[in-house]
């Protein structure tokens, strides 16, 4: 199963790369290479169309992005752009994981309260939903002002984007057990705590993993957004802002940072998916 999934991901990435270069072939800027990738073979190509969105400034060639990854991040430094972005990705991942865990715990706690106290659910769930209507790019500077320009603000933003899907999915999962199972537990004088641990929580695990896969990528997005106004010293958000200032002269660097950010989100999603497959062996997955 895992080999098929890995092959599917590899095929998807290959198709994206083919579509990318096909767009350049048809509507990009003219190509001229005196020695392509150091092979000594040169060629020239003049695309039949001129589409601004496919120009080298808007959409660099994949091999130009790869070349930028292998080049020094700054002139005179031994560190390559790839090494710099890997370090930035690890920094972002640290903030995202903390926000992911805290957001998941908050979401599960809120869902548990709402399931057991319907009055609180009717009173507060609309506000939980309304909180997600606030644009995160507008909320992030306010969080930075309130909590300071450090990793704390980044973690809070990642938590903010994580708790909502977990809350909604956990509410559905905790409400999913067969009522007869709950009545059976109560017939044995089980209290709410026992029913929660032995019936409700186990039944909610498939729903939780569906939400956690969404929250994993959301936490990466939140961490990257938070690193912009957060004033942190590293991270992919900081790299994206820095490279955006030099986009006219070096668009490949910004695209490299974007691609690494995407790979980080895919990696985090994959890790949660592996945990789901391991813990839910033989159980049917659900979609929320």
Regions found by a protein language model. Name each.
Residues 125-165, 172-173:
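Generic hydrophobic transmembrane alpha-helix motif, especially the helices
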Residues 28-101:
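Periplasmic/extracellular loop-to-transmembrane helix junction in inner-membrane transport proteins
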Residues 166-208:
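Short cytoplasmic-facing helical segments at TM-TM junctions of multi-pass membrane proteins
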Residues 156, 160, 193-226:
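Transmembrane alpha-helices
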Residues 98-128:
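Transmembrane-helix boundary motif in ABC transporter permease subunits
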Residues 1-2:
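Conserved small/polar residues in nucleotide/adenosyl-binding loops
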Residues 9, 95, 214, 222, ...:
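Pore-lining and gate-forming transmembrane alpha-helices of multi-pass membrane transport proteins
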Residues 175, 255-288:
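C-terminal transmembrane helix and the adjacent membrane-cytosol boundary/short C-terminal tail
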């Amino acid at each position: 199963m895992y080999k098929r999934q890995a092959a599917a991901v590899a095929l998807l990435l290959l198709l994206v790369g083919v579509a990318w270069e096909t767009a350049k072939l048809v509507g990009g800027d003219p190509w001229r290479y005196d020695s392509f990738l150091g092979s000594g073979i040169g060629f020239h190509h003049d695309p039949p169309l001129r589409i601004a969105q496919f120009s080298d400034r808007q959409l660099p060639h994949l091999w130009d992005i790869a070349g930028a990854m292998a080049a020094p991040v700054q002139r005179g430094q031994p560190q390559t752009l790839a090494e710099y972005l890997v370090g930035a990705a690890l920094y972002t991942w640290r903030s995202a994981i903390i926000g992911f865990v805290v957001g998941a715990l908050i979401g599960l706690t809120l869902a548990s309260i709402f399931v057991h106290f319907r009055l609180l659910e009717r009173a507060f769930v609309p506000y939980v939903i309304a909180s997600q209507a606030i644009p995160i790019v507008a909320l992030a500077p306010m969080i930075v002002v309130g909590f300071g320009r450090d990793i704390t603000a980044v973690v809070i933003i990642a938590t903010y984007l994580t708790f909502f899907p977990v809350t909604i999915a956990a509410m559905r999962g905790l409400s999913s057990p067969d009522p007869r199972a709950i009545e059976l537990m109560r017939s044995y004088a089980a209290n709410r705590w026992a029913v929660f641990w032995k019936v409700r929580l186990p039944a909610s695990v498939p729903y939780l993993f569906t939400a956690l896969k969404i929250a994993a990528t959301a936490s990466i997005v939140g961490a990257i957004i938070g690193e912009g106004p957060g004033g942190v010293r590293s991270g992919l958000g900081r790299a994206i802002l820095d490279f955006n200032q030099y986009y006219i002269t070096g668009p490949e660097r910004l695209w490299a940072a974007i691609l690494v950010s995407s790979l980080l989100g895919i990696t985090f999603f994959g890790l949660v998916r592996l945990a789901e497959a391991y813990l839910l062996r033989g159980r049917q997955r659900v979609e929320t």
